[in-house]
């Protein structure tokens, strides 16, 4: 998930510091909000979604639902 972009920015910088000929990035999910690191965006994106808590396909919700056969968003009411 590309959320705020700190990790992706660090990986890109690491690759460039080690003289990669080119660096392209891919993310399964890009969250749409204004908290991203400046100038960070993925070159390839599977889904673009609102800023919601997601689960399924390896992402858990409170320790459960990691094996859900899809990507789902938690209702904001349930995110307390």
Regions found by a protein language model. Give the residues of each.
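PRPP-associated nucleotide enzymes
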Residues: 1-80
């Amino acid at each position: 998930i590309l959320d705020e972009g700190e990790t992706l920015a660090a990986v890109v910088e690491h690759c460039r510091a080690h003289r990669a000929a080119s660096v392209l990035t891919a993310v399964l999910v890009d969250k749409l909000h204004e908290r991203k690191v400046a100038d960070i965006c993925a070159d390839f994106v599977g889904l673009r979604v609102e800023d919601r808590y997601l689960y399924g396909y390896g992402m858990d919700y409170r320790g459960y639902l990691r094996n859900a056969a899809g990507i789902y968003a938690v209702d904001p009411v349930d995110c307390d």
